[in-house]
Amino acid sequence: RSFFMKKMGLGKRVLACAVSAASLLTGTTALSAVAQLSASAASTDNYAKLLQYSMYFYDANMCGDQVENAGQMTWRGNCHTNDAVKGGFHDAGDHVKFGLPAGYTASTLGWGYYEFKDSYDALGQTSHLRTITDYFAQYFKDCTTLSNGTVTNFVYQIGNADQDHAEWCAPEDQSDASRQVYQTSNGASDIAAGYAAALAVNYINFGNAEDLSYAKALYEFSIKYNKTAEDGIGEFYKSYDYYDDQAWAAGWLYLATKDNTYKTFLNTFMNASNQGKSGSSGC
C-alpha cells in the first residue's frame, strides 16, 4: 500500500482510483467496528452486504457464452456469442465492450482485493471477486494475439457504439450477428496498458502465471507504439494521453516482478503525465 501512496499519490490515475475504491475502503475497514456500534449510530447499515451487492453489478453486465455458468444473476443468459472475442463485460447499460473502462475497472477491483484481502475472505466474497476478475482477465488475454511472446494484434473494442445505442433491449435479445471489431497492430497504448495493469494485479492476487506473461507482453506493446486508440472510440472514451495508464501498469508490474525496470517506467511516465505531456494530438 505504501508503495502506491508514495510513488503514485500525485498521479491523476491514483486520485481517480482512490475515489473509485472508496466504497471498498469504507465498507471493509468499517466491518470490524460494526458489531461495536451503538443502536443510535446507524446500526442498520450493513457494509458486508453492500460489498456483496456491489459486485452483482458485474454479473448483470457479463457478456459471452459463459454468463449462465459464471454469473450469479439467474435472469441473465448467454449473449453475443458470435462476437469475434467472446466474454468480457458490457459498459454502462449499453452492450459495447469498451477497452479503456474495462481495464481500469478490472485493475481497480483487483486493487481493492489486494488492499483488503482479509476482509473479502472473512465475508466469503473472495470467490465471487475472483470469478469477476478472472473473467475480465480471460477476455483481455483472448483479445491479444501473441507470437513468440510478442503482441502482434490487439482487440481493444467490440461493438459500434452508435449502432448499439440505437437499439434498446436486453443483451440476450440483441441481434447476435458478429459485431464490429476494433483492433490494431501498432496502437491503443492506453488500453493495452490498462489491460496489462489488470492482468498484473490479478497475477499478484491469484497467481496465474499466464496473466503475468500477457501483462508483460501488453506492456511492451504499449510503450513500443505510444499511440492512443481512436477508431471506434468517438467521444465516448476519447483519450489524449497514455502516460497515466503506463505508469499505473508499471507500478503493478513492479510489484509482481520486483524488476526495477518497471519502477523506472513508473517514475518516468508518472512525471510525464503530471506535467501534462501528451503522446498524441489534442490538448
In which residue ranges do the predicted regions lie?
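Low-complexity, Ser/Thr/Pro/Gly-enriched N-terminal "stalk/linker" regions
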Residues: 38-100, 104, 134-183
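Short, Lys/Arg-enriched N-terminal segments with co-localized hydrophobic residues
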Residues: 1-4
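Long, well-ordered core segments of solenoidal/helical folds
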Residues: 54-66, 78-80, 132-148, 214-230, ...
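Sec-dependent signal peptide cleavage junction
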Residues: 25-43
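Sec-dependent N-terminal signal peptides
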Residues: 10-28
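Short, surface-exposed loop/turn segments at secondary-structure junctions
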Residues: 45, 92, 118-130, 209, ...
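Well-ordered alpha-helical scaffold segments within catalytic/enzyme domains
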Residues: 56-64, 106-123, 138-146, 194-208, ...
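Active-site lining segments of carbohydrate-active enzymes
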Residues: 153-241, 247-255, 266-283
